[in-house]
Each structure stands twice: as structure tokens, then as C-alpha cells.
Curated annotation (Swiss-Prot):
Any one GO CC term of the record: nucleus
Membrane spanning residue stretches: none
Organism: Saccharomyces cerevisiae (strain ATCC 204508 / S288c) (Baker's yeast)
Other information: Present with 1950 molecules/cell in log phase SD medium.
Name this protein carries in UniProt: Uncharacterized protein YNL108C
């Protein structure tokens, strides 16, 4: 049986995005492995509540190994009582010129923070370079990820039709654009100049075009985007949207500084 529905969500609002703190240290001690803010935790619960009311619900979640993604996944895992697997293939994007390229915590470490939540029997579909990635590299990573990942899911869980991935803005965008068979994450998805939306806790849905099945190689299957960066269920709507048109890594200190400077300039003009 082929996977027919794929939800892809971004993690919730990070604690280091708050204008005045508090800024708790990374629970794992790993650089940039920050937790969600209280607001982000609330978003994660709103996401879980939204998903639990959908007609087509995910049957399992595959998460980035970074703390904020597991924290975002937790309410949905608990609400739907579905298994959670960690896959480094959907991990964060770090540029090569970054001083430190964070290595995510091991399963043993993360299980201490999320006891009995993370299923141990899943190996990464692909491992991001420990030297960082260019925009072209992360797009290629996601391109290589899909056929390996889907083949393993369909073999290991032959009765599963719907899955969910919880990841980061850049990875979410690159994953989606690869499903839609674009050659770059910077291309609009239609002639109106629309891009995949990547706000905090935003969720996309990709549906397999009818008539496709597991007998067709994954690379030849066609997908359609039926939900683009949906945040209608969030109290504050869309926040912290990011695309590859931004100059900085999503959610990085440089990104936050640039956003605040732009907002300050806007307020002065008003």
C-alpha cells in the first residue's frame, strides 16, 4: 500500500525568538538546540487539537531530532496515541560558514526528556553534512531523502496511508518543493508568485494524485499541495514565516535581529 497523505509541519515558536526573554539554555546542552517558548508550547497544543479533528489523521509522526521539534510533536502524539520516530534526514539546515554545526542528541539522551515517546527502531534515512549545507545542498538532501524514506516506511508499515513530519522552516520548504518536483526551493509554486508558507507551527498537506500506487517508483509519483502553511487554527495566526528568499538561517540570531530592525524601521515610518 502506498503512502497517500503527507503532512509536514514546522516546530512552534522558539524561546530565543522572544523579544525580552526568558532565554533558557538548551536542555540537551547542544548549541542552538533551544526549547519552545511558552507561546510555542501553546501553539503545539493548538496544532494537536486541529489535527485531532481532521477527517484524515496521521498514523505516525517522523520528527527532526532537535528538541523544539520533539516538543512540538508531543501533544499530537499524546492526543492521537500514535508512534513517533526520529529521522535526521528532516533535521535543521545549517550554513557552512556557521561557527558550530550542531550534532543532535542521541536517542538515549532525548528519551530522558521524552520518556516512552520516541520509538527506537528507526535509522536515519540520510544524515546532513557535519560541515554545513548550502541552499543547493539542503535541497539535494531532501531530494535524496524522499525515495529512501518512503520506501522504508512502505516496507515497514505496509498498512499506513497517512504520515506527518515535524521539521524546520528550510527543511519543510525543501521537502515540499521536492515533492512538487521543482528544481529549486526559491521557485514560486504557481503563476501568482505563491511560495510554501513556513510560519511557526504551520502545516502543509500533500496528497498523492489518484491512480498512483506503490508499484510506481517514488520518483515518478505525482503529488498535489492541498494545504499550504495553514495556521488558521492558531490564536495569533501566522508568525515568523520564512522562505529561502530570506538572507539568514531560519530563526537564527541574525534572522531575529533583521526582523526586529525591519519592524523598528516600519514603526518609525508610521
Amino acid at each position: 500500500m502506498a503512502i497517500e497523505n503527507i503532512y509536514i509541519a514546522r516546530h512552534g515558536y522558539r524561546s530565543n525568538w522572544l523579544p525580552k526573554g526568558p532565554y533558557p539554555p538548551p536542555p540537551t546542552g547542544i548549541d542552538n538546540d533551544v526549547p519552545l517558548s511558552e507561546h510555542g508550547v501553546e501553539q503545539a497544543h493548538e496544532l494537536a487539537n486541529y489535527i485531532s479533528k481532521l477527517d484524515v489523521k496521521p498514523e505516525m509522526i517522523f520528527s527532526s531530532p532537535f528538541y523544539r521539534c520533539l516538543e512540538t510533536s508531543k501533544p499530537t502524539v499524546e492526543a492521537l496515541k500514535i508512534p513517533l520516530y526520529v529521522d535526521r534526514g528532516v533535521g535543521e539546515w545549517y550554513k557552512p560558514d556557521r561557527p558550530i554545526i550542531p550534532e543532535p542528541a542521541t536517542h538515549e539522551v532525548m528519551s530522558k526528556f521524552f520518556p516512552s515517546m520516541i520509538s527506537p527502531d528507526w535509522e536515519p534515512s540520510i544524515i546532513p553534512s557535519n560541515k554545513g549545507e548550502t541552499e543547493e545542498d539542503i535541497f539535494e538532501r531532501c531530494h535524496k531523502f524522499w525515495p529512501v524514506f518512503i520506501d522504508r516506511v512502505e516496507r515497514k508499515f505496509p498498512n499506513v496511508k497517512t504520515i506527518m513530519i515535524v521539521t524546520h522552516a528550510a527543511t519543510k520548504s525543501a521537502l515540499g518543493m521536492n515533492l512538487l518536483k521543482f528544481s529549486s526551493a526559491k521557485e514560486p509554486i504557481d503563476n501568482k508568485g505563491t511560495f510554501i508558507r513556513n510560519g511557526s507551527c504551520a502545516i502543509d498537506k500533500f496528497e498523492l494524485v489518484k491512480g498512483e500506487n506503490e508499484s510506481i517508483p517514488f520518483e515518478e509519483r505525482e503529488w498535489k499541495l492541498t494545504m499550504n502553511g495553514n495556521t488558521s487554527f492558531l490564536t495569533n495566526g501566522e508568525e515568523m514565516n520564512w522562505t529561502f528568499m530570506n538572507a539568514f538561517e531560519a530563526g537564527s540570531d541574525a534572522d531575529i535581529k533583521a526582523r526586529r530592525a525591519a519592524e523598528s524601521g516600519k514603526l518609525k515610518m508610521e
